[in-house]
Structure formats: structure tokens, C-alpha cells
Design a protein with these regions (language model features):
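Short beta-strand/loop segment that forms part of the nucleotide-sugar
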Residues: 27-37, 59-62
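A recurrent flexible, glycine/aromatic-enriched loop bordering the glycosyltransferase active site
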Residues: 67-68, 141-142, 147-173
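Donor nucleotide-sugar recognition loop
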Residues: 90, 164-168, 179-193
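Glycine-rich, basic loop-to-helix element that forms the pyrophosphate-binding segment
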Residues: 61-77
Length: 193
């Protein structure tokens, strides 16, 4: 199941949708979550898929944070894997979804795979936020810092790096594991103070 949350991207969304349609292999569904759009994003999506043989669902959300919109899509998904594709991401690699599944096929303890970037977290001994009582909404929390970055720039094409955190889609997640967690936590944002 491919989850595409969209918020006011009428100028780009046709390229995003076509990238998925032209490069995804095997049986799949697309779940479009229209996230509080005030432009023509929804119309452009329907225009793009109108003549396509595509299994899809559409859900609507008020203008909510991306995590909540993703959860809406996850809960509608039928596949054993769910893939998050952001509304500004154009897929260009044929069979990209099968390639992302390779770590799941090779190991039985994989939770998620990203095609973009992953890293580990370590305690920041110079943190300014540890033991702060107030909730700061003007900066990222610095209690932990990311390290050991694995990106397209520093990781060979055929290497899958193991890290504690994956972010930025496309992001494939084991759907059963996600259900066991009761999906993504919509309130806890460890980096946002």
C-alpha cells in the first residue's frame, strides 16, 4: 500500500502521481490523503488517475500534521507493507518498491526502510534543553543529535545501511508492526520542543 498525503501541491502532484504509476511494480494500491488542501491538488490527482487501471482509496483530513495524515492512510491500507511517499517526491526508478523490500526479504527483524536518509542518535553532552520545564516551540530539541548518516551521497547504491532512525520517504514500513504499535504517535514529537 502506497500512502500519498497531499497538501496544496497542485503544481507538482501530477508528476508525483505519475512517478508512482510509471515505476511501481507488482500489485499495489494507492491511498491518497487529501490534507486540508485549499488549491486544486485533489482535482489534479483525479485528472491524473482518470484513465488509469489503479486500485486506490481517497481519505480527507483537515489541515493536520503529516504524521496524522500518514496514520489515516495506514489505517486504510490493506498491504503487508506500507510506503509513505511525500507530495514533493517524484519517483524515477523502475521497480523502486521491490528494491525497498529487499531488506525485509533478507532479514526478519526489519521495521522500516528508507530510500533517502537514515541515521543514529546519540546524547548531546552540550544540550541546552535537558531538564527545561518550558515547552519551546521555536527550535528543535538538542538533547539528542543525529550521527552516522547514511544518505544517497555517502552510501553505495547496492548497500543497505542499518540505522536506528529512518526518515524522509519513500519510507517502507512493516504494516503488522505498525498496527502492533497502534500506528505512529501523533502527540510525542521528541525533536519539537
Amino acid at each position: 500500500s502506497i500512502i500519498l498525503t497531499a497538501h496544496n501541491k497542485d503544481w507538482l502532484i501530477n508528476h508525483v502521481v505519475n512517478g508512482i504509476l510509471e515505476n511501481t511494480e507488482g500489485d499495489y494500491e494507492v491511498i491518497f490523503v487529501i490534507d486540508g488542501c485549499s488549491d486544486r491538488t485533489e482535482d489534479v490527482i483525479f485528472e491524473t488517475i482518470r484513465s488509469k487501471d489503479l486500485k486506490y482509496k481517497v481519505a480527507y483530513a483537515p489541515d493536520v500534521f503529516e504524521t496524522k495524515a500518514n496514520n489515516i492512510g495506514f489505517k486504510l491500507a490493506e498491504g503487508d507493507k506500507v510506503i509513505v511517499v511525500q507530495d514533493d517526491m517524484i519517483i524515477k526508478e523502475p521497480g523502486w518498491n521491490l528494491r525497498m523490500q529487499e531488506p525485509f526479504n533478507a532479514f526478519d527483524d526489519v521495521f522500516a526502510v528508507t530510500s533517502r536518509t537514515a541515521h543514529n542518535w546519540i546524547f548531546n553532552p552540550d544540550t541546552q534543553h535537558l531538564n527545561m520545564e518550558e515547552d519551546l516551540d521555536n527550535c528543535w530539541c538538542d538533547i539528542c543529535i543525529h550521527t552516522d548518516h547514511a544518505t544517497m551521497k555517502n552510501t553505495p547504491r547496492d548497500v543497505f545501511a542499518v540505522r536506528s532512525s529512518v526518515n524522509r520517504g519513500p519510507l517502507m514500513i512493516d504494516h503488522e508492526d505498525l498496527k502492533k504499535m497502534n500506528y505512529l504517535d501523533e502527540e510525542f514529537a521528541p525533536l519539537d520542543m
